[in-house]
C-alpha cells in the first residue's frame, strides 16, 4: 500500500514539477537562440525614479515623456487580457511595468504571459502614472534576460525557516527587504569608519592572514600547512602584533579592517570568522582611545542610519549621550550591590561565589588566577549583561592583559578598557606595552599557562620582541568588532543576521 505523501514531500514534489516546466521553457529559448542575452544596459534605477518623481502627477509625467530603460527581477505579474502589469525589482527597489500588445507587439506579449516570477526582465519605455496613481513604465520594448528555474518562496510567508535564510542568503536577499536594508547599513557603517579614520590621518594597511605564530589575542587558532615552506601556519586570530610592528617602523597611525579567525564556539555573538577593525596611534593612551572610539561609533550610526538614536530589541539607545566609565569592581557593585569591598578582594570568597554561579573554577585558566582575574570572571557573571547603555569598563588586571601597559599609579592594573553596549563587548583597547623586557616576561608567563593546559594562552613571539627592542613610541591601540557594531545599528539579535554567509553545518 502506498503511503500518503507528507506535506514536506508534497512541497518538494511540486517544486520539482515547477522546475521541470521551467526547464522546458528554457529549452525553447535555447532553441530560439535567445536564452541569455547580454546586450541590455539600464539607464535608470527604480528607487531613483520613485524618489525623483514621487510628487509628479499624471499630467506632468505625460508632458515630460521621460524615456527609461530598466532591468530587474519580476516579483509580481498580473495578466488582464489586453493589458498586464509586472512589478520588477532591481538593486535599488521596485517599479511597475505596464505591458500591452499594442505597445510591445503581439508576439512579445504572448511570450511575456509565459514568463515566470523570478525571471530577470528588461524594458524600455516611458515613465507615466496609472489612473490609480502608481508610478510605472509604459513598455515599448520588453525582453527576458535570464530564466529563473527555481520558484521564489510564497510572497506572503517568504523564507519562514531561519536556517534556510542563512543557507540560501541569495533567496533571502531577493524576498526580504529588511535583509537588504541590513547589509546596506553595514556597508554605510564601514564606509563611515574608513572616512573617519582617513580624516584623522590614519593609513589603512593590510597585514598577513597566515601567521607563523598566532598572537594578538587569547584564542584558539585554526591550523593549516604551508606546502611551499613546509611549515605549520595559523589563520590569524588578530592583526595586533603586525600593526604594532608598523608603529615601530614609523607609520604613526595605522588601521586595518579585515577578517579574524578563531576556532571556537558559535553563538548569537560569536562566529569563527568575523570582521574586526584594529587601529594604533603613536603618542596616545587609553583615555584618548576611549574619546576617539566614542566619536567613531556615534558617527558610524549617523552615517548608516541618519541618527545617533537607535532602537535595539524594543529599547531606545541614545549614542549621542556621553558613554559611561566604570572599573570592574564598580560595575560589579552597581549591578550586584550586595558584594562588599572585602568580599571582592577575598580569593576564597571569589572562587566559592564563582562556583555557586556555575563557573568551573577547576579549568586551567583559573588554577593560578589572581584576585584581578577572579574579579573579572565575577563581573562577567553579574554585571556584563546589564551594561545596556554604552559603558567603558576600565583598568583591567595585568594577568589578563598581556599586551597592555601597566598603570603608573596602581600596581597590577593596566591602562585597558572594553566597551560594552546592550550587554555585548564592542571594543577592546589599551595603552600599548612598549617595554620589550616586560613584554618578554609576560610572554613567558603566557607560555607557562599554555603548558598548564590553557589553550587560549599566547605563544612567545621572538620577532615581535625584536621589533620592540628597536623602540616603539608610546602608543594606544583598539579593536572594534564590526559585526557586533552592525548588529547594534541594525537591531539584529544574532551575529548571523549581519553576515552574508554565516557558517552552518553541512546539509544532509
Swiss-Prot record:
Question: Which EC numbers does the record give?
Answer: 6.1.1.6
One GO biological-process annotation of the entry reads: lysyl-tRNA aminoacylation
Q: Which residues bind Mg(2+) 1?
A: 418, 425
Q: Where in the cell is it found?
A: Cytoplasm
Q: What class of enzyme is it?
A: ligase
SUPFAM superfamilies with a match to the protein in the record: Class II aaRS and biotin synthetases (SSF55681), Nucleic acid-binding proteins (SSF50249)
Which keywords are on file for this protein?
Aminoacyl-tRNA synthetase, ATP-binding, Cytoplasm, Ligase, Magnesium, Metal-binding, Nucleotide-binding, Protein biosynthesis
Please give the name of this protein: Lysine--tRNA ligase
Q: Which organism is it from?
A: Burkholderia thailandensis (strain ATCC 700388 / DSM 13276 / CCUG 48851 / CIP 106301 / E264)
Amino acid at each position: 500500500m502506498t503511503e500518503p505523501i507528507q506535506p514536506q514531500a508534497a512541497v518538494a514534489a511540486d517544486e520539482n514539477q515547477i522546475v521541470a516546466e521551467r526547464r522546458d521553457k528554457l529549452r525553447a529559448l535555447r532553441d530560439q537562440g535567445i536564452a541569455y542575452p547580454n546586450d541590455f544596459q539600464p539607464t535608470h534605477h527604480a528607487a531613483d525614479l520613485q524618489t525623483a518623481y514621487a510628487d509628479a502627477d499624471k499630467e506632468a509625467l505625460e508632458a515630460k515623456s521621460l524615456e527609461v530603460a530598466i532591468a530587474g527581477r519580476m516579483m509580481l505579474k498580473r495578466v488582464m487580457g489586453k493589458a498586464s502589469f509586472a512589478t520588477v525589482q532591481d538593486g535599488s527597489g521596485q517599479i511597475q511595468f505596464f505591458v500591452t500588445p499594442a505597445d510591445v507587439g503581439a508576439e512579445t506579449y504572448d511570450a511575456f504571459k509565459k514568463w515566470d516570477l523570478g525571471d530577470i526582465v528588461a524594458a524600455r519605455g516611458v515613465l507615466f502614472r496609472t489612473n490609480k496613481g502608481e508610478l510605472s513604465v509604459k513598455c515599448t520594448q520588453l525582453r527576458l534576460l535570464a530564466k529563473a528555474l527555481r520558484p521564489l518562496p510564497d510572497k506572503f510567508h517568504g523564507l519562514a525557516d531561519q536556517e534556510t535564510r542563512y543557507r540560501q542568503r541569495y533567496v533571502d536577499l531577493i524576498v526580504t527587504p529588511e535583509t537588504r536594508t541590513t547589509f546596506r547599513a553595514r556597508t554605510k557603517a564601514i564606509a563611515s569608519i574608513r572616512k573617519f579614520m582617513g580624516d584623522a590621518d590614519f593609513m589603512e594597511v593590510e597585514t598577513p592572514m597566515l601567521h607563523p605564530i598566532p598572537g594578538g589575542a587569547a584564542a584558539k587558532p585554526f591550523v593549516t600547512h604551508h606546502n611551499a615552506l613546509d611549515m605549520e601556519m595559523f589563520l590569524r586570530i588578530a592583526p595586533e602584533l603586525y600593526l604594532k610592528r608598523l608603529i615601530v617602523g614609523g607609520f604613526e597611525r595605522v588601521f586595518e579592517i579585515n577578517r579574524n579567525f578563531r576556532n571556537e564556539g558559535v553563538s548569537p555573538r560569536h562566529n569563527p570568522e568575523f570582521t574586526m577593525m584594529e587601529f594604533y596611534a603613536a603618542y596616545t593612551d587609553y583615555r584618548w582611545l576611549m574619546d576617539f572610539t566614542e566619536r567613531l561609533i556615534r558617527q558610524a550610526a549617523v552615517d548608516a542610519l541618519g541618527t545617533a538614536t537607535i532602537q535595539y530589541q524594543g529599547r531606545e539607545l541614545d549614542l549621542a549621550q556621553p558613554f559611561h566609565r566604570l572599573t570592574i569592581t564598580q560595575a560589579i557593585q552597581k549591578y550586584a550591590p550586595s558584594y562588599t569591598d572585602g568580599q571582592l578582594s577575598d580569593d576564597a570568597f571569589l572562587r566559592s561565589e564563582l562556583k555557586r554561579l556555575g563557573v568551573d573554577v577547576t579549568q586551567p585558566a583559573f588554577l593560578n588566577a589572581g584576585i584581578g582575574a577572579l574579579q573579572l570572571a565575577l563581573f562577567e557573571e553579574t554585571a556584563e549583561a546589564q551594561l545596556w547603555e554604552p559603558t567603558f569598563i576600565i583598568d583591567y588586571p595585568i594577568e589578563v592583559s598581556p599586551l597592555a601597559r601597566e598603570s603608573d599609579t596602581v600596581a597590577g592594573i593596566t591602562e585597558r578598557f572594553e566597551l560594552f553596549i546592550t550587554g555585548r563587548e564592542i571594543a577592546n583597547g589599551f595603552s600599548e606595552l612598549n617595554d620589550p623586557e616586560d613584554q618578554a616576561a609576560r610572554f613567558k608567563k603566557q607560555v607557562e599557562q599554555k603548558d598548564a593546559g590553557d589553550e587560549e594562552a599566547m605563544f612567545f613571539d621572538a620577532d615581535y620582541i625584536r621589533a620592540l627592542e628597536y623602540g616603539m613610541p608610546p602608543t594606544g591601540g583598539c579593536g572594534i568588532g564590526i559585526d557586533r557594531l552592525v548588529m547594534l545599528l541594525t537591531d539584529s539579535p544574532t551575529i548571523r543576521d549581519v553576515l552574508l554567509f554565516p557558517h552552518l553545518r553541512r546539509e544532509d
